[in-house]
Every structure is written in C-alpha cells, then in structure tokens.
Amino acid sequence: MNKFVSIALCSSLLGGMAFAQQTELGRNPNVRLLESTQQSVTKVQFRMDNLKFTEVQTPKGMAQVPTYTEGVNLSEKGMPTLPILSRSLAVSDTREMKVEVVSSKFIEKKNVLIAPSKGMIMRNEDPKKIPYVYGKSYSQNKFFPGEIATLDDPFILRDVRGQVVNFAPLQYNPVTKTLRIYTEITVAVSETSEQGKNILNKKGTFAGFEDTYKRMFMNYEPGRYTPVEEKQNGRMIVIVAKKYEGDIKDFVDWKNQRGLRTEVKVAEDIASPVTANAIQQFVKQEYEKEGNDLTYVLLVGDHKDIPAKITPGIKSDQVYGQIVGNDHYNEVFIGRFSCESKEDLKTQIDRTIHYERNITTEDKWLGQALCIASAEGGPSADNGESDIQHENVIANLLTQYGYTKIIKCYDPGVTPKNIIDAFNGGISLVNYTGHGSETAWGTSHFGTTHVKQLTNSNQLPFIFDVACVNGDFLFSMPCFAEALMRAQKDGKPTGTVAIIASTINQSWASPMRGQDEMNEILCEKHPNNIKRTFGGVTMNGMFAMVEKYKKDGEKMLDTWTVFGDPSLLVRTLVPTKMQVTAPAQINLTDASVNVSCDYNGAIATISANGKMFGSAVVENGTATINLTGLTNESTLTLTVVGYNKETVIKTINTNGEPNPYQPVSNLTATTQGQKVTLKWDAPSTKTNATTNTARSVDGIRELVLLSVSDAPELLRSGQAEIVLEAHDVWNDGSGYQILLDADHDQYGQVIPSDTHTLWPNCSVPANLFAPFEYTVPENADPSCSPTNMIMDGTASVNIPAGTYDFAIAAPQANAKIWIAGQGPTKEDDYVFEAGKKYHFLMKKMGSGDGTELTISEGGGSDYTYTVYRDGTKIKEGLTATTFEEDGVATGNHEYCVEVKYTAGVSPKVCKDVTVEGSNEFAPVQNLTGSAVGQKVTLKWDAPNGTPNPNPNPNPNPNPGTTTLSESFENGIPASWKTIDADGDGHGWKPGNAPGIAGYNSNGCVYSESFGLGGIGVLTPDNYLITPALDLPNGGKLTFWVCAQDANYASEHYAVYASSTGNDASNFTNALLEETITAKGVRSPEAIRGRIQGTWRQKTVDLPAGTKYVAFRHFQSTDMFYIDLDEVEIKANGKRADFTETFESSTHGEAPAEWTTIDADGDGQGWLCLSSGQLDWLTAHGGTNVVASFSWNGMALNPDNYLISKDVTGATKVKYYYAVNDGFPGDHYAVMISKTGTNAGDFTVVFEETPNGINKGGARFGLSTEANGAKPQSVWIERTVDLPAGTKYVAFRHYNCSDLNYILLDDIQFTMGGSPTPTDYTYTVYRDGTKIKEGLTETTFEEDGVATGNHEYCVEVKYTAGVSPKECVNVTINPTQFNPVKNLKAQPDGGDVVLKWEAPSAKKTEGSREVKRIGDGLFVTIEPANDVRANEAKVVLAADNVWGDNTGYQFLLDADHNTFGSVIPATGPLFTGTASSNLYSANFEYLIPANADPVVTTQNIIVTGQGEVVIPGGVYDYCITNPEPASGKMWIAGDGGNQPARYDDFTFEAGKKYTFTMRRAGMGDGTDMEVEDDSPASYTYTVYRDGTKIKEGLTETTYRDAGMSAQSHEYCVEVKYAAGVSPKVCVDYIPDGVADVTAQKPYTLTVVGKTITVTCQGEAMIYDMNGRRLAAGRNTVVYTAQGGYYAVMVVVDGKSYVEKLAVK
C-alpha cells in the first residue's frame, strides 16, 4: 500500500512551498530565464515547486519516493530515486558550452530513507510487480547524483542548435541518510573558445518553425536569425510505391488546392529495390534544397513497399525526418498511409480529404473526446500519476478548452462494447494510456477484430496512443493502427483519421509526458507554440518528452509512428462559418488578388485542377494572394481553410482564352426549407463544342495536345477511326507505324513501360508485331527499314471501340526501332471511344519527335450537366435543366453547374445559396433498425418540437385543428390586447403599404424602437397578446417576423405563454427570445429609404394549458421597427407518449430536464449513474439510471424528490426500479401535483417498500465503492394510473435508512386525448431509393430484403419542405437460417410432387452470439450436436498459454457450497502445500480426471484439451493454474464471478461448455463457448410462381394437385422461430415441353419494357397469374409494366416456355 506523507521544512527557505496530500499533480513551470544575451550567455534559475514524498514498502522497511513538479526519475535501477528537471536552451552554432552554478540555497533533512529506483519500466510490465532492490550506491558515503547542474550533448532542431541544462535539486547520501533539498539554483550557460560537438552549418531560418523554436528554447530570440523567406506554409513530398502512383492524384490535388505545395516521388525512382538508406538520403537532399522549406513527408505503402529504418531495438519512420546533426530532433514531420491494396489507400485518402474539406456546422460530434486508462501506474510514472490520474488531467484540460463531452473508460471493467459505442456515438479525439499489443488495446481488449463493428462513417477522431506495439506495421498481419486507418463500412471510412502509435514496447513514463504536451499544444496552452496539423502537434509533444527523458525519450520518439497525413489540419470543436468575399473575375495578368475573410489566420489559396498559383494568410481581414504561373485558365478555384472553420470553396472566372465548350446560362437558385432548386437554360450554341470548324487547341497534359474539330463523316456504330499522318519528319526517308493491341496486355511486354526503344537493334523478329490485331498501315512490317510505313502521307484503320495498348513505332535504318518521343506515342489501357476519329500527326518536337492527337466527333453534339456544391461534385449525367437537393445543411453554399461534352467541359456557372435553420423541419428521433431473417423493422420517435412550417398559411383553416389565424390585414382585432409597459405612448400598431409591407400581404403589425417625425430614440417594452385560447394539450405557434430597417435590424423580442391571465405579470418564462438579424433584403417597401429586412418564419411549441400568448418587444433602442405577421396557432389533439431513459444525463450529476429536491438537506439527492462508470450496475435499457441512496459510505435518512417536467394530459406512468437485493427495503412513493413543483404541492398516489426481491440468477461483479459488494436486484416493472389534472409526477425516496439505494429507469408516460390529423408524414429510403412514403405510424417493416448491408433512412415530409434524413445501417444475413437441400419437382399423374431434404442438422437459428457474463469477459453461444440429454459436457482447452509448460485444471463442485470457502472470492486457491484430499473431498468432477492439488503437478492441461461429462445442474467451479516458481495454485483471471471461477453456475443439460485459456493483459483469462444441442424447430412454406400456396408443413414433400400440365416455378423456404431461410427454387417443365436451355427455335428480346418474340410458329406472353397478355404468329410484341412474365412458343408441335423479368 502506498501512503503519501508530508515533511515539515522551513517555509522561508522553500519560498512558501507547501507539502500536502497528493491529488492530481500540478504542472506549473518552476524554471525561469533571468538573462540572455547575444554573446551567448544565458542565466537560468530553478526554484523547487510542490515537493512531495510517497511512502513505499521496501526490503529495508518503509522508504520515501520524492516527486516535484516536472521532475523525472532517470536514476538507474538500484540507485536512489532522485528526480531531475531539464530545460532546452538555444546555444552557439559551433562553440562548446559550459554551465556554472552562480548561486544556490538548500536545506537538509536527516534520517531519511530514499527508496531505490526501479529503473525504466516498459508498458508490457506491471510496475507493482517489480521489486525495490538496493544497489551498491547505498554503501557509498557520498551525495548522489553529485552535480546539481549539468549539460547534455548539443542537438539540432532544423536551424537552431540547442542544449539541455539539467537541474538535480535533490542530493542524497545513503550512508548518513541525509537528503539535501535545493530550493533555488541559479546557473549561467556560456560559450567557450573550443569548437563543440554536433555543430550547425547554418543556411537560414524557415519562418514556418518560429513557434516551435519559441516553445522549445526558453531563450530563443527570433532576431538572432534572418529568415530566408517569409512563408505561411512549407512543402510536402509524397513518396509513393510505384503500384499506387496513379491512385494518389486526388490527395495531391487537394493538398495543393488547400495551400500546401505538394509533390510526388515514386519510391522505385529513388532506388530499386527501395531501401531505408536511399529514402533517408533522398529526404535529406530535398530538405537541403534552396528555400529550406520541406516540412512534411508522407510515405505511401506498407513496410515491404517503403521500408522503415531498422536498427537494434528500433523500427522507425521518424528517423527520415532527423536530418541536421546527429540527434533525435526531427526537422521534417513524417507520416505514412500504410496500405496493402488500392482499397486500403483510397479510404485513407477519402477520409483525409473529407475531414479537411467537407466538415460543417452540423458535425456535432466534434468537441467530444474519449479518455481510456488502465488501472495501473503511480509513483514511477510521469509526475507520479497513475494512468487514470493522467487521463483525468487531460480530460480537465480538454473541458477547459471547450470540449463539450468527455467519455471516460477506465479499468477495471472496460469492454470492447464501451469503445465501440463511444466511437459510433461520435468523438473527435481519443487519448489512450495503458497496455497494448500488435492488434489491440489492453484496456477493453478492443482490437482489430472489433473494428468492423464501427459505424462512425466520416465522424473520425484522431488518436494519441500510449501503448506497446499498437503501431508495429511490420507485424505479420495488419496492426491495430493500420486496422483503424483502413476501416470502412459500406464503402465509407470508419475508425480514425490519424493515430500516433508505437512500433515497439513503450516505456511507462516518458510517453505520458509526450501525450501531455500533445494535448497542451492542442488546447493552445502555449501561445508561442500553436500547431494546427497532426504532425506538428504530435512531434512538438515528443520534443518535450525528449527534453525531459533524454535517451529513453529519443527511443520513444523514433518509434512513435504517425499513421495518416502529417499535414492533416486537426479539428477540435464544432466548426463555425467564415464570411469570404472575392472578385467574381480577375485578369490573367493580375499580379495578386485580395480576398476578404472574417477569420484572421485562415489560409486562402488560388488553384486550378490541382495546381497552386498562390496562397496567403488572412491578416486584418484580408489575404493578398500573389499569383504566379497563370497561363490560359478560364476558371480558378479559391479555397479558404481555417482552424475549426467550415472550408470555403468558390469559383473565380478569368479573362483567359474563351473556352470552346459553352456553359449554361441564366442559372437561378431557390430554397424551400432545406430544399434547394436549381434551374438554368441550355448552352447558347449546343453544338459549339463539337461542330465548330475552326480548330481549337487545349492542353490536356504535359506535351499532349487535344485538338477538336468536326468530323468529315460518321463512323459505323461501335467503331473508331485511327489515322496516322506524317510528312518526312526527319528528311531521311524514315517513317512511322501505329501498333494497336486489342487484348491490351502488351504494355510492359512488347511495348516497354520504361523506355522509348521498341527493339534495340536491327535483328528484328519477323513476328514482333504478331500480338497487335491492328496496325497503320494495315500491312506494317517489323524492320529497321520497313517496306510498309507512313513517311509522307496519311493512312487509317477502323477498329472496334474499346480499350487498347498502343505504340507509334519509328524505325531508324541500321540502328533500332524507336517509339516516337513526346505526346501520346505509347499508352497503357487507352480507351478509343465509338464514333470518334483519332488523328495522330507526327512532328519534330525540340530535338526529337512526337505526335499531336486530334479527336474528331462523328457529327453528334450530346452533353450532360454536372452539379457541384461547395466544390464537391454531387450529381452528374443530368439531361434536364433543373436539379433539386433536399436536406441541405444550414448556412451559405455555392452551387455550380458545368456542361460535360464528349471532348471536354465548359466553365462552371455558379450561384450562392443561403439555407435557413436546419431545425425548421425537425427530423425523426431515435431511429433504430433490426433484422430477423430477411425482414427489416424500423422504429423511431416523432420529431421533437415538430413545426408546421407552411409559408402560405391557409386563411380558412380546417375547423378543429387551427385555433387562431391572424394576418392583421384589417389592423389589430379588438379581441387582441396591447400593453405599453414602458408608458411612452408607443405600443404595437397596425401598418400598411406603402412603407410597411406584410409577409406576402399589404398589412402587418409593428412596434418601434425609433420614432419618425421628431420622436427619436425609444426604449420599448410593448406586449401584443392573443385572445383567450383553449389548449389543454398544448399547441404549435407559427408566425413571421422581420426588421423594418435592414441596416438597423437588432430588434429584440420574446414570445411567452400564460396559463392564467393576460396581464404583463402573467408572462414570465420566455418560450422564444432572440435579436433579429436582417441578412438580406426581401421587400422593396421603404420608409424614407429604409429597406425592409428579410421575413423569417418562427415556430414555437406551446405548453399544455396555454390560455394566452404574448409577443413582447423590449431591450431594444435606437433601431427602427419590428414587424409581425401571419400568426397561427394549432391545438395538439394528443400529446405524444414519451419515455425518459436518462441517456442524455451525465454520470454523477442530477438528471437532465428533471427537478430534484433534497428535502432532508444532506447534500445527497437523486443523481444519474452510468454502467460505463460502475461495474456493479446494469441499466434496464441503455447505460444510465437515476439513483437515490439510504447508505453511501455512511447511514443516510433520505427525503429526495425526483420531479418530471410538465406532463399535463398523462394518464399512466410505467417505470422500472431495482434495489440492493441484500438490503431491499428502500421505501419510495409516486406522487402527483396539479399545480407546481414545490415539495408541498405533491400528494401520494402509490407507495411501497420493496422486499424479498431475488437476484434473478445473476450478479454483476463487485463494487469499487467503500463497502465492497452492491449486488443489484432484477428490474421490477410498475404501472400507476394518474388522476385527471396531473401536471407533474414525483418519485419520493424516504422513510428508510441505512439500507443502500433505489434505482429508476425507463419511465414512460402515457398521454390521454384523441389524436388529430398529423401535419406531416414519413418517407422511408433504402440505399438511397425511396421505398415508402405517406406513412403516419412510427414503424415500418420490409420483408425479403437482399443479403448484405443496407442503409435505411427516414425523412419527415412537411407541407412546406422536408426534414434532414435520419439513417441507420442494417445487415441482412439470411444464411444464418439454413435452407432446404436438393429440391426436386416431378409429375405424378396430373399432380406435381415436390421433394426435398431437411436443412443441415446444425441448427442455425442458434447462430453465433456473444453476451457479456462478467467483468470484461464474454460468452460465445453457437450450435452443436454432440451432447446427450440430461447431461452437459465441460471442455478445458489451452495452448501453452505462458510458454513455460505450466497448465490448467478444472474443478467442479456439484454441491455448490465451496465458493467463498474452498474457492476464495479473490486470490489463489492455496499457497504452498495443500491437503492431499483437497480435490477429492470437495470436487466431484475434475479435468484432467487425475488432477491433484500440488503446485508442481504434471496432471494439467498444457496444450490440447480435456473434457468431462456431468449431470446438468448448479455447480461451483474454478480453473486453477499451478505455478511452481511462486509456490501458488493460482485461479485464472482477476477474481469475482467470472468464467474462471463461479458461484452457483448452471450447466444446462444438452449443452457443451468449452473453456479456452488465453493471455489477458498481464494475467490470464478464459473464453467460454456454449454449444446447444436442442432440436431445430421449423416448418416449410411452399410457393408457386411467387405465390404462397402452403405453409406450416413439417414433412419434406408436397403434392400440388392438378398442376402437371403447365410449367411453374416452385420455391420452398424454411420458417424458423427467429426468421426464415432463403428460398430454394426449381423450375417444373411438363412432359412434351422442350427445355429452353436446349437450342431455341425463336428469339426473345427485352428493350426497356418492350418484349419481342420472333419465331416460325405461334407465340404467347403470360403474366405470372396465367393470364394471356398477347399472342400471334411469327412476331409478338408487348409493352410490359415491370415484373415477371412467361413466354410460350409452339414450333413444329413442340412447346417452349421461358420465364423473364422486366425491370
């Protein structure tokens, strides 16, 4: 046991320092800079801060472990534990440095035993199990470590040489037991005349690292270095394996587009084979190029593609970035897209681009973080923290920064499901500190096998991972980090967007310092070290680790690998929008362009097609972008990125050469709710792009020209024409030949991929051209001096359109056969399109030759439209001149339309669109999807605060639904009331045009904050109050509001409801309160030039019992008028039933949206508890409950009220409660109030004292609370009728003491009244296709869904628009229900007899299922067939778990009375020697049968398995692990009711239980598999031609009477209790009807929906009900409606029947 103690020291010497009990340790700086001059003299002062001592048990008794702020123990094992503290200084580039102590102060403490150091502890070790060992130093009469100030060897960080000064303020003499405590040390670090080690040959400073230097070096002075060039960004090189070169383009284009100059280098072009040394040398050369701006390197490929640098104990990517000097400080940030396939790479590219480009204000998962910690650590860890303390410090930091939700998963008891739920619920950051393996986290055991359960599509966190070998990408299978980066669900990225993880076993303490610093940088704790990229945050975090932990920190840095893009712009909180304006058009000759932006620090970039022309940082609201490299671009892209901002992408036109492809014209955009509608006119000259006879030239890639002209003639369908033209290019009689390979497999074979030599000499094989199906000229011959070639003239060949490899041969006499030089002279997999002519014109190009390719259209001019939103393509292939998109996110968007012609695309035409309030059309809530067999069931809750947003209110509403509708066309009705509460004589007034315009009308009402006619400034407090209303169940209020003056729009108002009177004092709590913003101009009406603002529709839920509604204009002054119009109120016919699950509440806090009263005043009222935080707790549903205690560490006398929100109209309340089954008497009552929420307002309607509640056969582990066990009872359901007039319901816990607790969950209120017609319906989509609309129920079922993963979405359709879709993924796996086998159909008389075999004996509705049965452990249940009735089989299996040939035994007690006596609840079974009859006297069954109670026994299961058959029933049991080395008979696992030891476990008859032993973190554990032998229960259902004709069959045969004369399709499915199997079908063909699989004497075609039958006989077409639809001789044509049809043809007396489908 550790104990924290204080040592009384002289406070004056310690500067007021306090010694206190340890809590979470502070991290305050205790080193300051006193003086720093350019003469390279730096004075630094250390002061002791927060010195503490921890008592630990050692072989010499209790000893002390000292700690202080930022002190780190680097003492060798066996040496006294004496932390030191380090700081980095910038020093001379070349000189040796020295340190001198200028002054110091200390005190001494006598008779102190300092504990010996345990040395550096790795994270694959348990610190508690490492003993304290006193070394030789404890016999030496001197102070350790000796020097109080030292210098480390110098290092180089890019352009600055640094050196670490170390302070050792604790000096200890182990012989005299004297501890000398230096409270203050002042040192001077200065140059000497000697040349130092690791000198810096300075080239200048790249400005992008200024903040890093300021943070790293406490004496850094920017003025000491002259930057070569001021740049806001560096450069990135992507080193890519050759096989992925073509897949990286989108990533590189995006990086350039967002302002990071990015280049590509193929790894095999650096060296072949690729080596680590070659990569290292290449990066060094790139770094040393002029400009010194290489900042990022991204490696693309796995280790076998681009190897990591391997040295003893090191597997490193990071060393590639360590360039200057011989230290371990990176100059370049390194990352890796580790991939083994193109799919692996694509998902990493997609997730990175989406994260930087497409995140919006709707991404509410940002700002939510997950902290995971092991239950280990402590004094030997960084800052003396346990992993949990460490993560709590991080969690507090994140909360202070603005993170809105922190999920804490701390051992013991964390499960994979906890992690899966956290990811799938949406998180943006993960900090993990604990054990790890190559494929999993130790805490939770969440690993690569669980990744497939993640559904967090594009809601991707980045991860700071402190664990062993999670990043070992040299492992034999994908490591944990790789799995998270490659994860995807239904083609969408899941998992993580970036992770830093180690390739080796990490040390215990040093990575914690790195993780601390990463989070501090992320949360901007260091103003001089703000980093916005994942590489910048993580690398700078590791620098702090190296500074503090020296050599061990260097090793950790080298192996801590970034998986993902190091330049990734990280996001922490929900983004906000930027307002960006830029010129609509610029000149190509402009030297710069100014972009206005309201976010300083944003980066604005001009680019086109992935090429960057300029980039600048926004300063003082403007980015001035200097432009270079513009040539003839007709449109440019402006991209603006900012920290925690939505990315803005806009199009800028230029005055470049006119694009030959005409754009659309008259583009317009309108919005309705969240629906955007675009309309445009077709291009002005539709054929301009293809029929203009004037030749135009456009560069399509480097040195390749595409010329477009009209074709002289049309080609035959499906063909392309290839033309070769040359005119004595070399003037030597040589010419050219084109070779075309239709199999397209000759590139890299006959056509070389890496050279322009087709054949190296003139010994040319006669069959060289044999693989080429087509040549130009057609008789081209392979020779250096060929007979057939094109020297001066033109030849052509027509080929089938398709994919070809091709090359243009250029024979040279007496030399070789070349491939022509520049342009498209050889291509791999080139597509020649039908209807086009490809004209290759040979020319001299520079010192060589090449070709200009002209592609001519065959006379057509077809085109389609492509639509973009915010720079992202959202629809292509359109032919109509309109487009609609529903569910668009709130905010400003840019929509663009371009025309795609066959030979090119037009410039984009764009329009800005503003979509108002996403919650205007509320979506469904709590959508869930489940599947049984092939049936999918969806369930959801109605929209919250459902509006009825009708922009044109009906002046004649349907009676019974609309209570009030007022448009104020005739002024303010007499039934309305106005109150001028401020008494200035100016209240609400009617207004009419001209001057004041209503919404879509002439009149409205208004209130003034500024009066015309000399009145001037007003400070209104004006009420406009409705007539009396009757809303017993509440209602919906909608109205329209605007500011009369768009330039003075900040009018403030509120909406209130009163259930009593209509005086101002009756309106207290605002239902809606806001200040208007104009945002635009809608109406041309004006008062003295004041332009009216935009009308906004608002919706407010009115509470039950509302009698009056008031509109109050107040807290406004010196604006103008507020206008109000079209007020409508609809009554709710029935309040929706609702259930409180407490899932939105926070653990340890009062439940959200409920009122609590602690009437006894003991400070302990109702609060939320989460099973994710308490291992003894199991919620009724979800994870959260509410609880009240009568004992919690001490006896309590509770009187606690839990009060609902207003539930007016409720008739029943149903709820679930649970108590401690050992102390079940916690008394409670259900109470109601018809008035208020004070305790005195409530009366009892039901109360009880729970008693005699059983456990229900399960316990839920042991509590970590003060008094140990808190076994929870089963959940008890209660339903209580509520009297009429109930407004509030309270649960009161009282009249009890010194018991334990009562828990409540899933409280459901049933509301009364009769429903009225809804104002909306539901529409259901599957995989993007609408499958059902017009639904009014909140459930939907669909049967017969295809196997695989499906996305189901539900949207709400309102009168004026639709809600965003809410979606859920559902997986259909019908094969879990085995089908019949060998189905046959045979004639028997006039009947058809079906026969089949039963499904496979393995009962598949008992398919594999995983359930939690203990703390972090699982049971797997799957079918089996090898256990007899009334018996159970137990199997013990192992595979040399510990590698030392120790094994396991299984002990079973049929009397089930040994648990807690012979079998301890925790700890080993015994230590030392046990009674020889221990087993025989207590356990009836053993595995192995000869198991004996001896720790050295060989009667164990080491490798293999043993088994025993036992009677089904209740047993106590345990699994033992004899260990000779410790002399203990261990019990596997960690104790408690788990699969390794159990009290009263039921082994059910007819089942087999297999216990497989495994390693589990630092210990062992078991997985239990249960196989079920109960017989299958199912029946058969028979279908004929798609119609069910028989169900409930149990026999494997069926007779279909009277059906043998016709052809039919028969199907049989198996119906299980839990679902149905896939159908198995067979076609029945009667005798005399020919099999259509034979040669058919007819033709049958389906084009669209038209069926055509041609034969030399009679043909008939039937539907599947046997109705004849068409008939005739020779040819029959029928237009179908979709579905299945049958065709019968009779030719020469034989009948032929064929079934077909029409889509």
Swiss-Prot record:
It comes from the Bacteria. Ca(2+) 3 binds at residues 385, 390, 516. Its EC number is 3.4.22.37. Ca(2+) 1 binds at residues 302, 473, 482. InterPro entries: Caspase-like_dom_sf, Cleaved_adhesin, Gingipain, Gingipain_N, Gingipain_N_sf, Gingipain_propep_sf, Ig-like_fold, Ig_E-set. Residues 1-20 form the signal peptide. Gene3D superfamilies: 2.60.120.200, 2.60.40.3800, 3.40.50.1460, Gingipain r, domain 1, Immunoglobulins. Ca(2+) 4 binds at residues 517, 520, 526. Residues 21-224 form a propeptide. Keywords: Calcium, Hydrolase, Metal-binding, Protease, Secreted, Signal, Thiol protease, Virulence, Zymogen. It catalyses: Hydrolysis of proteins and small molecule substrates, with a preference for Arg in P1. The keyword Ribonucleoprotein does not apply. Residues 940-968 are annotated as: Disordered. The active site is at 435 (proton donor), 468 (nucleophile). One of its GO terms (cellular component) is extracellular region. This is Gingipain R1. The gene is rgpA.
